[in-house]
C-alpha cells in the first residue's frame, strides 16, 4: 500500500484507473471503517482511502485538537484490508492557502438536525469532500449510514454538481450490545459505556411505537418528546430525537405519515462529555 500526502502525487498514482472506489475517513479506524473498505472492494478497484482530520468541520468548542490521531495503527489496518493507496495529507497539503471558496449545502438539508446544533459543520464536510473527490477522482465513494444526514447531503451534492460518482451507502456496524461503532466511543468512561447502548434502544422504542400505532391518530412530536424525556431521565442531554422522511429528511406531514411514508428516526445526545449520534430506519 502506498501512503501519499500530495494531491498531485495521488493523481499521478491513480492515472489510468477508471474504477477507483474511495472511502474518506478521519482516521482512528475501527471495524466500522474497515467494513467500508470491504464494501468498496465490491464496487470498484482499486480501493483508495483517505485520512484527514478536517478543521473546517469542527466548531470553536469542539474536539479538533483532541480528536484521536492513530496514523501508524491505521496504516496497518488498511494494509490488512488490501487498500491500494492511503491519501493522508497534512493540513498544509489540503489547504496550502486559506480556503476562501466553500461548498454550502442547501438550508433545508444542511441547517437542520446536526446542522442546527453544529453550525457550519456540513459546509466544512462538503468542502473537504469535494476537494477529496477532485483529488482522487473516484467512480465510487462509500459513506456509512451512521452519519445519515451527511450521506444525504453528499448524495445530493454529487447529483447537483453532476459528478460521475456513485455514492454507495454502508450499513452501521454495531457492538454486540447495539452501540454504533464510533471513534468518539473511546471518550466514554466505563459507566458511560455501559449506559451508551440505551441510545439505540431508544430508537428501537420509537420505531416500535410508530409501527404499532394508529398512524392517523399518532402525534410524532409526542413520540419524539417522550424519547427525549426517557434519555434525560437516565442522565443524557439529548439535542434531538427526530422522525423524518428518508427521502429528504424533512418532517412528514400528518397526511404523509398516515399514508405510510418511509421514515427514519435520528438522534444526537450527550452522555457525560461525549456526544453520540445514531439513527434507525422505520
From Swiss-Prot:
Chain sites annotated for binding beta-alanine: 57
UniProt-listed InterPro entries: Cyt_trans-like (IPR004821), Pantoate_ligase (IPR003721), Pantoate_ligase_C (IPR042176), Rossmann-like_a/b/a_fold (IPR014729)
Pathway connected to this protein: Cofactor biosynthesis; (R)-pantothenate biosynthesis; (R)-pantothenate from (R)-pantoate and beta-alanine: step 1/1
Binding-site residues, (R)-pantoate: 57, 150
Keywords from the UniProt entry: ATP-binding, Cytoplasm, Ligase, Nucleotide-binding, Pantothenate biosynthesis
Location within or outside the cell: Cytoplasm
An individual GO BP term: pantothenate biosynthetic process
Active site per the UniProt annotation: 33 (proton donor)
A GO MF term: pantoate-beta-alanine ligase activity
GO CC list: cytosol
Residues that, per the record, bind ATP: 26-33, 144-147, 173, 181-184
Catalytic reaction list: (R)-pantoate + beta-alanine + ATP = (R)-pantothenate + AMP + diphosphate + H(+)
EC number: 6.3.2.1
Other comment: The reaction proceeds by a bi uni uni bi ping pong mechanism.
Family named by the database record: Belongs to the pantothenate synthetase family.
Subunit: Homodimer.
Job of this protein: Catalyzes the condensation of pantoate with beta-alanine in an ATP-dependent reaction via a pantoyl-adenylate intermediate.
Protein name in the entry: Pantothenate synthetase
Organism encoding this protein: Cupriavidus pinatubonensis (strain JMP 134 / LMG 1197)
Amino acid at each position: 500500500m502506498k501512503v501519499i500526502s500530495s494531491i498531485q502525487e495521488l493523481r499521478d498514482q491513480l492515472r489510468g484507473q477508471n474504477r477507483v472506489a474511495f472511502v474518506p475517513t478521519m482516521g482512528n479506524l475501527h471495524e466500522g471503517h474497515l467494513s467500508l473498505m470491504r464494501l468498496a472492494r465490491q464496487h470498484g478497484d482499486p480501493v483508495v482511502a483517505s485520512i484527514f482530520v478536517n478543521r473546517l468541520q469542527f466548531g470553536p468548542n469542539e474536539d479538533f485538537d483532541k480528536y484521536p490521531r492513530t496514523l501508524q495503527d491505521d496504516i496497518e489496518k488498511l494494509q490488512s484490508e488490501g487498500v491500494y493507496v492511503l491519501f493522508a495529507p497534512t493540513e498544509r497539503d489540503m489547504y496550502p492557502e486559506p480556503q476562501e471558496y466553500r461548498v454550502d449545502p442547501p438550508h433545508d438539508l444542511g441547517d437542520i438536525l446536526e446542522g442546527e446544533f453544529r453550525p457550519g459543520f456540513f459546509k466544512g464536510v462538503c468542502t473537504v469532500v469535494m476537494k477529496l473527490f477532485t483529488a482522487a477522482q473516484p467512480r465510487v465513494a462509500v459513506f456509512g449510514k451512521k452519519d445519515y444526514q451527511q450521506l444525504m447531503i453528499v448524495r445530493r451534492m454529487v447529483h447537483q454538481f453532476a459528478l460521475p460518482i456513485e455514492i454507495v451507502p454502508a450499513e452501521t456496524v454495531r457492538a454486540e450490545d447495539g452501540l454504533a461503532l464510533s471513534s468518539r466511543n473511546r471518550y466514554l468512561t466505563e459507566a458511560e459505556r455501559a449506559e451508551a447502548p440505551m441510545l439505540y434502544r431508544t430508537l428501537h422504542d420509537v420505531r416500535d411505537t410508530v409501527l404499532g400505532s394508529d398512524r392517523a391518530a399518532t402525534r410524532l412530536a409526542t413520540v419524539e418528546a417522550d424519547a427525549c424525556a426517557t434519555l434525560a431521565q437516565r442522565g443524557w442531554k439529548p439535542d434531538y430525537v427526530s422522525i423524518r422522511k428518508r427521502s429528504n429528511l424533512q418532517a412528514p406531514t400528518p397526511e404523509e405519515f398516515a399514508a405510510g411514508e418511509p421514515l427514519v428516526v435520528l438522534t444526537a445526545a450527550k452522555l457525560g462529555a461525549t456526544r453520540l449520534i445514531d439513527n434507525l430506519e422505520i
